[in-house]
Every structure is written in C-alpha cells, then in structure tokens.
Curated annotation (Swiss-Prot):
Role noted for this protein: The UvrABC repair system catalyzes the recognition and processing of DNA lesions. A damage recognition complex composed of 2 UvrA and 2 UvrB subunits scans DNA for abnormalities. Upon binding of the UvrA(2)B(2) complex to a putative damaged site, the DNA wraps around one UvrB monomer. DNA wrap is dependent on ATP binding by UvrB and probably causes local melting of the DNA helix, facilitating insertion of UvrB beta-hairpin between the DNA strands. Then UvrB probes one DNA strand for the presence of a lesion.
Taxonomic path: Bacteria, Pseudomonadati, Spirochaetota, Spirochaetia, Spirochaetales
Domain Helicase ATP-binding: 25-412
GO cellular component: cytoplasm; excinuclease repair complex
Descriptive protein name: UvrABC system protein B
Molecular function via GO: ATP binding; ATP hydrolysis activity; DNA binding; excinuclease ABC activity
Record Pfam families: Helicase_C (PF00271), ResIII (PF04851), UVR (PF02151), UvrB (PF12344), UvrB_inter (PF17757)
The species this protein was found in: Borrelia garinii subsp. bavariensis (strain ATCC BAA-2496 / DSM 23469 / PBi) (Borreliella bavariensis)
Amino acid sequence: MIDFFLNSEYLPAGDQPKAIKEIENSILLGNKYQTLKGVTGSGKTFTIANIIKDLNRPALVVSHNKTLAAQLYREFKDFFPNNAVEYFVSYYDYYQPESYVPSKDLFIEKEATINTEIEIKRIRTVTSLAKRRDVIVVATVSSIYALGSPDFFKKSAREFSVGQKISIKEISDIFVELYYERTLMNLERDKFSIKGNIIEIWPSSEHGEFAYRICLDFDEIVEIYRISSFSKKNLGTTNSFTLFAKSYFVIPYKNVLEAIPKISYDLNLQCQYFKDNGKLVEAERLKQRVEYDLEMLRETGFCSGIENYSKYLSGSEMERPYCLFDFFPKDYLLFVDESHVTLPQFRGMYNGDYSRKLNLVNFGFRLPAALENRPLKYDEFDALINQVVFVSATPGLEENLKSRVVVDQIIRPTGLVDPEIITRHSDGQMEDLYSEIQKRVALKERVLITTLTKKMSEDLTEYLVSLGVRAKYLHSELDTLERVEVISLLRKSEIDVIVGINLLREGLDIPEVSLVAILDADKVGFLRSTTSLIQTIGRAARNSNGLVIMYYDTISVAMREAIEETNRRRQIQVDYNKKNNITPKTIVKKIQNILEKELNNKNKNINYDLEKIISGERLSKKKLINKLKFELEEAVNDERFEDAIVLRDKIKELSSKISVARNK
C-alpha cells in the first residue's frame, strides 16, 4: 500500500499542532463525530492534510459548492502530488430535470448538457477508489446522489499484460462488454480501433493525456505502449494495464434480463391501480411509456431514462441507492468543510427531489420505482459516515451537539489577529464610509462593502464613482468572467473598492483588503445572522491592518454575539503574540501566479493545436474550445484570475482564426 506523502515546505504552526493532535486522538479513540472550529486564515486545510497523512486513510472532503470544492481540490493536489487526489462534482453544465406541472398539464422532458471533463474526473474518482487506498476525493452534494453498484464496477476490471494469451477478437469482445465502442475513424475517448494485429483504446478515465496500443503476434500480447491520444506519439512501454468499464453505471446484461419481468409485473399493478381509481389516461400513458422502455431494454440493454429503473437493475435489496460513499473502504475519513452550510444543504436534497418525482408517478409518467433513483435521506447519509470531522469557523448546533471533541484553531501561523470591530450609527454613514475609504486608498489598501440587495450595491457603487472612488459592484448577475475581472482589478489596484451582497459566496479572501464595511448590520435575516456576520468579518482577517465597521440603527442580538466572539478570539491571539514576541504580517499572495510547468506545457500545446485546427488536422474546434473552457473554469476556481483572462483570450482567438480559415 502506498502511504500518503505530504508535500509542504512548512510545518504545522500556531494552533495547528494542537488541533491535529486532538482530532487524531479523538479519531483513534473511535469517536464518530469531531469538530475543527478554525478561524478564517488559520490553515484548516493544512490541518486536514496532516490528519490524512498521519492516519493514512482514504478521505472524502465535501464542500457546499463547486467553486470551493475546486479550490480545495487544487490545494490537496499540491499537498499530495504522489497520491490520487480526485474531484467529484455534478457534471451538468445545464440541467432541466424531467417534471410535470399538473396545474398547466405540462410535461417537461429532461434536458441536460454534460461537461465531458468533469465526467472524466468522476470516472477517475471511482477508478482510483477501485484500484488503491491512497485516495483523497473532494466532492459536493453530488456525493449523495445515486450511482451504480461499486461491486459491479470493481468486477468490471480487466487486466492486459505482455505475454498474455488472447486474440484480437477476445480483446474486442471485452472492450464491448465494458461499454467501449469500436471506431473506424480517428481514436476518441471511450472508443477503440483495430488495425491488423494492433488494437488501440482510449480509456474513459484518462484526461486526454494518453491511450494504450496493444500489439499481438499469434494471439499473444507482445508489446503494450502508452501513446499520445491525439498525435499517436509513443510515450513509452508498459508491462500491463487495467481497464475498467467506461461508466460507473455498470449493468450486467443478465441483470437487464432479470429486471424485465419485474418491471412488467409492477407496470401491471400500477395500471390496475390507476384503473381502479378512474385514472384511465394515467394508466394508458404509463403503459405506453414503460412498454416502449421494455422493448428498448430487450433489444439494446438500454433505454432513455434508464436510471428510473435502477431499483430493478442494481440487483440490490438495499432500501437506498448506491452512492459515492459505497465506493470507499469502511475505514475512510469524512471531512465536511464549511459544515454550517454543507450539512443543511445535504439535509434538504431528498425532499425537493421526492416532490418532483411524486408528480411523475401520480400522473402516470413513471413507475413508483423511479422514486428510488434519488439522493440519500439525511439519516441514510449519517449512517454511511464512518468517522467525520466537521470543519467550520462557525459550526452549527448539530456539530456542537454531536461532537465528542470540539477543537479550537484560533492562532494563525502568520500571527494575524481577528480585525478590530467598530460600530457606528447609520446616520451620516455615506459620508463616514467615504472618509474611511479615502484613508485606505492613501495606504494603498482595498475595501469590501456588503449591502443587502443588488439594487443597493449598484446605487452605492454609482454614488462612490461620482465622488471619484474607483469602485465596482459584484453580484450574481455578473457572469463568471465578469466577476473574475472585477476581483482581478481590485488585486492589481486598478480599483479600490468592491461593493457586494453575499461576499461569502464569492469566496473573497483577498489579503489587500484591510477594511470591511457592513451596511444595515442590524437587519434580521440570513445575511446578517451571527454566523454570516462572523464569516464576513473574516474577510478582513488576512491583513495586519484589518478593520470592520458595522453601520446600524439598533444593535441586534446577532451583532452583539458576532462582536463578542470576534473579540474573544482577538484577545487570545493578541496575548499569544505578546507572549511569543510575534509581529503580525499581512499575507503576501502573488497577484499573478506564475503558471506551473504543467500549465505552461498546456499553453504551448494550445498554440500547436491552434495551427492544427486551422489546417484541418487532428483536434476538432469543438474539442479544443471545450478543453480551453474547462481550463478556464479551473483557473477561476483556483483564483488564478490572470490565467483565466489569458485562456478567455485564447478561446476568442481560436474562434476568430477558425472563422477566418473557413472564409478563405
């Protein structure tokens, strides 16, 4: 077994050593629940990495959105370059679920656009879990949605090795059995080609880097090469490789044959139920739809919406569907990042899905078994937990009640302390805010201002600009690239102020920000709860001059609690710094991260591919643009804003050159 190797030039510091030790001791004692209560900027991710390394167990890290999950994924990839760090999030760029609106008698067909690159990462995730133990998976709520049987997937593995006695036809049959398709054209992902005594395959779990070439002589494998997927260049030989099914929804054909009579039986029962209750339209509708699906299953082993029959096809007697958790070994560790947000999100997934599908069942669009293709109920999710560490600066009631151990991580390795908080009455707040902005601009520092509505953020930005302040607003109506550019402008000092609404959702941890101004801090609601206020205060915790100003009419309970908790932490941090003679220093974060060698190589390949495209060779326009768009999304999620803008420009350049080439 390969051990986890943590790659870092730093050792745990501040409260990290204590937190690591206490969490590890709790886990080794067999406690199921523990909480890491770490302030913003205290290095919670590094603490998690050390726990994984020390306990040497597979780990699942779940976050509440794709952006934060991508940031964690990049950090863990850097921490563990020699281990399998995988990424498992929803692969839909667009998703309109199948639904029925009774009031309008409107049936809406399922529509979806799948992100191929994300799908590859998902397949790589289950492949890694099937092959090895040194695996860290960073995931979102997708981790509790239905997947195929882990046993079927693991049993799909086929090994090919030099010296193996096997014919081209036998290899071809195995590939087809694993859902790969033969192509007579250029090799593509999920396909294989045969030319004489050579067979090539591009595994679904490979990220485009390479494929395999198997050379045979008299029904014996004599050589296996790793080759470039696009150029077919030889990348070296290997003695063997293992191939898994191209999808984690592996359904043996015998299961399909066994499922058909069960589906027919339930169809008759449900149709009879509709007829007995005078629902003749529903009975006829269901009969037509399911009989068509059954015919497709008999002929091809597949049908549209096959996931709605997963209860019959899985061969499992379980009352819940399989999910990502089932692919992990029993001793895995779960880390729930930002647990105060993530746990409520997990809790709410089942009910929304159930109510939508219940309409489909009640009105004859689906069999009742379709209700079993669903996310886990919260108690099912909880039952699948082996041992968990909840991670949050502001853990909720559930984490505090369940955890046998709650560990504070208050002291930052940088010596930075929580910001000072000043409360000011809202009378004359605009003039006061303008004055404070001017002070920060003079020091070449930045300002974040949080409002309650989009209209307020736009109006305030317009007002500040009219006074000569370099300001931009930031909210959900801006697309990804526009948000990227606004943040990039702030970091490069081309603007001094960002006015936003939910700055937590934007994931704004910008060390240049020394002032956070909270307007209407006393208003009751989600954005001004104790938890949200503490999290917002943390936006100023990465600068040694951090200051928070709360503008109010009447000091609210949430304000008082947030101020008291922040002051408690601040005092502990100040006392520690005095005792250890530490001078806090603002975090230095490069404005433009120099691209790693890997990305530089990719960019060189991009230029090469542009020429290939223009001359009509190799990679198609659609594939290359999709590849660049995926890299753009990764750059945005990693906060590599300069890289994102470069990639955006390359996409525009490619589209332009293709257009010119076609017009010649």
